[in-house]
């Protein structure tokens, strides 16, 4: 059988519609999807993330948590994002549930200083607390990185990361991370694991969600009932 000279027919054949066999059409579509996925991956670059120096000081306090992620001791692999992705949170306004921090200032959360030493973190009161970053406009988000307190090996309770287009987080809320396994915060039992703080921070895949506001919850830690934030970075594109 000769090849049709009609470009519309050739296009249909390439897309799989010219094949009567359903299996053949399925295979062709999978091949095209694979090619498109490969092209998309080729456009991605490592996340432009600068890590602070390790800062563990003193004697670690032993603790046990039922849902604790076991440290691997292996450096986190590069996280790929579209080219042009930047930290949209740098210098952006921050609000918090505790408006009178015990230590530090709320703007420390997005000031770009991730050292974790005295004068670079904010300490909020006990119980469930949150900080919220206003990116200024809706953006496509790819990763959120949070450093609570990396001068000591500790884990924070009920860590929940949500994004929304609504300032009050009443509508259109998306939960990207939740390790509140007991539903203490009331957002549903989380399936993510608690983790030990390190200078790498915790990288959360934002999966390309569109949002303007980012809110992070915590409920004390394995050392005290207080809540801390060294830095929050939100990587995306406007």
Feature roles, as predicted:
Residues 41-85:
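N-terminal pre-domain segments of enzymes
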């Amino acid at each position: 059988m000769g090849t049709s000279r009609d470009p519309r027919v050739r296009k249909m054949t390439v897309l799989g519609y010219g094949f009567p066999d359903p299996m053949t059409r399925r295979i062709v579509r999978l091949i095209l999807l694979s090619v498109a996925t490969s092209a998309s991956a080729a456009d991605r670059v490592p996340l432009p993330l600068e890590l602070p120096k390790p800062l563990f000081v003193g004697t670690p306090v032993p603790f046990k948590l039922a849902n604790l992620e076991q440290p691997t001791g292996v450096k986190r692999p590069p996280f790929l994002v579209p080219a042009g992705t930047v930290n949209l949170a740098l210098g952006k306004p921050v609000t918090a549930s505790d408006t009178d921090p015990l230590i530090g200032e709320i703007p420390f959360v997005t000031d770009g200083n991730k050292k974790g030493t005295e004068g670079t973190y904010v300490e909020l009161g006990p119980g469930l607390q949150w900080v919220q970053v206003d990116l200024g406009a809706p953006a496509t988000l790819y990763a959120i990185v949070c450093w609570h307190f990396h001068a000591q090996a500790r884990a924070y309770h009920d860590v929940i990361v949500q994004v929304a287009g609504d300032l009050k987080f009443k509508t259109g809320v998306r939960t990207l991370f939740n390790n509140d396994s007991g539903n203490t915060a009331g957002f549903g039992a989380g399936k993510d694991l608690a983790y030990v703080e390190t200078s790498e921070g915790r990288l959360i895949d934002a999966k390309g969600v569109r949002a303007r506001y980012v809110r992070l919850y915590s409920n004390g830690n394995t050392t005290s009932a207080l809540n801390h934030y060294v830095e929050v970075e939100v990587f995306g594109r406007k």
